[in-house]
Amino acid sequence: MAEKLTDCSRLCIHTMTTKPWTLQEAVAGYIAAEATGITVWRQHIEPYGAKKAGQILRDSGLEVVSLCRGGFFPATGAQAREKARNENRRIIDEAREIGAPLVVLVCGAVPGQPRAVSRQQILDGIDAVVPHAKEAGVKLAIEPLHPMYADDRSAVNTLEQANNLIFALGSEQVGVTVDVYHLWWDPFLESEIK
């Protein structure tokens, strides 16, 4: 049987897990739970704007661990891919404004498009925004999603695929986010983490 959690000093709570709460309610609730960190989903900062949301977060004393989510790079047309890149640059700016050192990337996929094509578009998209992320002092983290999301959410479904993208990018600005919900099944999970 698992031990009861008694030390929350390293606990970070994601605002999506308390979705009905506003950012202010989440901040108050997390502090009451003695959590020290917060990961913010973009929809929770939208009602305030990044500047005001950043002030709320700074005033709270919580450590902003990351901003979710960027990504969604694949598209069937070049104009749509460039629009996604520009949106990711705005997301990086939001992360900087709220004090998040990291943007989690849900990389995207296009239904009916071969996943290899989508992965190449993901690679190209991340590569295009890395200079902006570096300038902003914000890191990017590829989050592989469970294969059930491969059709329209992410063509990156294993940690190996994410690590291969990172290797190809060759940038210290890019890493991975390992979510047990999405990767528990991966037979190479432990070796890919190492």
Q: What spans do the regions from the language model cover?
A:
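Short, well-ordered coil/turn elements that cap or connect secondary structure elements
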Residues: 6-8, 59, 135, 171
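Short secondary-structure boundary/capping segments
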Residues: 2-5, 54-56, 95, 131-132, ...
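Boundary/entry segment of secreted carbohydrate-active catalytic domains
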Residues: 2-23
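Active-site-proximal loop/turn and secondary-structure-junction residues that shape catalytic pockets
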Residues: 17-19, 42-44, 70-73, 107-111, ...
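A short, Lys/Arg-enriched amphipathic alpha-helix followed by its capping loop at the start of a domain
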Residues: 7-11, 29-36
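Structural motif corresponding to the early beta-alpha repeats
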Residues: 36-124, 134-135, 139
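Short, acidic/polar
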Residues: 18-30, 49-53, 82-93, 186-193
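Acidic/histidine-rich catalytic cores of soluble enzymes
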Residues: 24, 31, 38, 67, ...
